[in-house]
Amino acid sequence: MKVAVLGAAGGIGQALALLLKTQLPAGSELSLYDIAAVTPGVAVDLSHIPTDVTIAGFAGTDPTDALVGADVVLISAGVARKPGMDRSDLFNINAGIIKNLAGKCAEVCPNACIGIITNPVNTTVPIAAEVLKQAGVYDKRKLFGITTLDVIRSETFVSELKGISLADVEVPVIGGHSGVTILPLLSQVKGVEFTAEEIATLTPRIQNAGTEVVEAKAGGGSATLSMGQAAARFGLSLVRALQGEEGIVECTYVDGGSEHATFFAQPVLLGKNGVEEVLAYGELSEFEANARDAMLEELKANITLGEEFVAG
């Protein structure tokens, strides 16, 4: 199993690479790529960690060598948010980066599963899809927007609020991956009751948690370490599913035939070909149903923006 990380020299990429080096199954290959000259050195640094995962690093303008034979490609390349920016401010820079890297994946590893971390995910995933379609290699089962950070934040905040073990907390998160498009389904957390006030406080905290980190870092970065952990959780789940482990479910932003939008995050059963089955997200509370309906205009506009970017 070969996993490639594109954008591996950045804050998310390095955290993700560390977790993959220590947690990928024995015999896996890990390939790191970034335009930054430091990238081969990041690989050398990680190579000193004693695990049965081989690692190589590549720098420069062409990721081809990193992508040859890749089964999974995780893309975190791009610029990060700074105070005062929202995810849409990132669009002009990151859209072009994703377009180029998706094109390289189409050319070098057309059968790989691709997980997009680069924001704005609501838009960068449709960009990748359009590029893959133009190349004639699009398989909607193999393209994912990694929204796992919204899930782990939800689990953490619920655990803290209710004083319960994280082992007992599962929170499905549907919709998209920015602001009001992030919808944690708190009504579905088993064994936990929330007051209307708790839901009204917790939901926006989850939606705006990225801004909380950006502001706390005072211009020194965005959520890199927690995002690295979230991407590793998703990537490792995907690897296990590709290797035949059954029953692995993660929430992710996919082209899954949703009645709401072309791309929509919801629980997905992963399998040997990527998406095995898009699962129903169950019954919503009145608050959640209203929030879902209210987000759709923004989510659809984000998707259209990506499609039109590739169409030119």
Curated annotation (Swiss-Prot):
Tell me where on the tree of life, at the top rank, the source sits: Bacteria
Q: Which UniProt keywords apply?
A: NAD, Oxidoreductase, Tricarboxylic acid cycle
Q: Which GO terms describe its cellular component?
A: cytoplasm
Catalytic residues (positions): 177
Which amino acid positions bind NAD(+), per UniProt? 7-13, 34, 94, 117-119, 227
Picking any one GO biological process from the record gives: tricarboxylic acid cycle
Q: Which CDD domains match?
A: MDH_glyoxysomal_mitochondrial
GO terms, molecular function: L-malate dehydrogenase (NAD+) activity
Q: Where does substrate bind?
A: 81, 87, 119, 153
Entry EC no(s): 1.1.1.37
State the function annotated in the UniProt record: Catalyzes the reversible oxidation of malate to oxaloacetate.
Supply the NCBIfam families for this chain: MDH_euk_gproteo (TIGR01772)
Query: How is this protein named in the record?
Result: Malate dehydrogenase
Organism per entry: Moritella japonica
From the UniProt record, report the name of the gene that encodes this protein.
Answer: mdh
